[in-house]
């Protein structure tokens, strides 16, 4: 019987068949962790040297070999072999080819369990920084757009029906606040990712006199995990990321859904740049909002990655199980998806053309000023419920007569209630309706300018 030549093969008499090997291998995707695997190994072997577990000479020779591997990796000169299963075994084999049997000492006081957890913490910690940078850029684009459209008036909707006139900037600031909370969630995610699993070993720690604090400091983590079993068993930092990413994608998807509607012939509120639209292969007139639709569509795949990993984790006993190999591809794909989506959404918004006239025109139809008349009557002492009923009858009669509220004469309006006077026509103007809503968080122009100023100040403080 052929001897098992795997680095872990001492206990085995038989060999693994190729098709089984292909099923179990992860190198096709976990090679994304190669840089972090080398960085983690450099910290580990430096710690081994400083604690006397390896001689300083041994530690330095291994570090030289690892640094050479890192240079070759960055130059695209490393080839990985599926026979070596995963990125950890591939890197150890490559190191052995470079420095000989001394490479075998690198794995002293370390398991692949804490090794892969360390790689993934390092990877996600870096990616969270990129996500937050792109979110900050998107929020900046939103603020710039909002600042230019405080006085641009559009219909506000409930149930996709005209509700009340609002400032377009106000609508944009609603999304700004959603994205701000997304940023805060990712920042909290950083806290849980900024923990070092290295030195946890397989699950129970090690008998070697390692210095886990030193390893953590070398890798610039805030602190080591305080329980080794926890360090190698859980992937909640990834689940937290996938959850945050799902909420972010939901917010982007909702925004894209609105832009898809707004650029349609039925709305004509905005025009998307040609850069973010695609034509039809058969209909020459078409300009389709494909990029917005793709963000909306990709939201589902991010949700899927979250539910997939939750399902993997739900019944796993402590500590490590091979099921955890399934934690990576969804994370990698989610990172790529949200980074690209943030770029595309920011690009769409920065090149957006706003049709102010169409927005304004739309507010003058479908009775979005009806609440103004009800508030007007309530402000003159009429109980709001009675005012609501009066205006409801007027709206019904307006529909039957094909009129807008402002089309009725004063004498006609006074037949509905005597409290209505000449000044009602000012109140029925969309601009007045917006301007008067200056309660905290309202759509009044002063309030919107205040919201923008507060947001800009907070953004500047973050820089």
From Swiss-Prot:
Please give the Gene Ontology molecular function terms for this protein: argininosuccinate lyase activity
Family annotation (InterPro entries):
Arg_succ_lyase_C (IPR029419), Argininosuccinate_lyase (IPR009049), Fumarase/histidase_N (IPR024083), Fumarate_lyase_CS (IPR020557), Fumarate_lyase_fam (IPR000362), Fumarate_lyase_N (IPR022761), L-Aspartase-like (IPR008948)
E.C. code: 4.3.2.1
SUPFAM superfamilies for this protein: L-aspartase-like (SSF48557)
Q: Please give the Pfam families that the UniProt record associates with this protein.
A: ASL_C2, Lyase_1
What CDD domains does its record include?
Argininosuccinate_lyase
UniProt keyword list: Amino-acid biosynthesis, Arginine biosynthesis, Cytoplasm, Lyase
Q: Where in the cell is it found?
A: Cytoplasm
Q: What domain of life does the native source organism fall in?
A: Bacteria
Give me any GO biological process, just one.
L-arginine biosynthetic process
Q: What is its main location?
A: cytoplasm
Query: Which reaction(s) does its UniProt entry say it catalyses?
Result: 2-(N(omega)-L-arginino)succinate = fumarate + L-arginine
Pathway this chain belongs to: Amino-acid biosynthesis; L-arginine biosynthesis; L-arginine from L-ornithine and carbamoyl phosphate: step 3/3
List the record's Gene Ontology CC terms alphabetically. Answer: cytosol
Similarity section: Belongs to the lyase 1 family. Argininosuccinate lyase subfamily.
Q: What is this protein called?
A: Argininosuccinate lyase
Origin species: Streptococcus pneumoniae serotype 2 (strain D39 / NCTC 7466)
Q: What lineage is this protein's organism placed in?
A: Bacteria, Bacillati, Bacillota, Bacilli, Lactobacillales
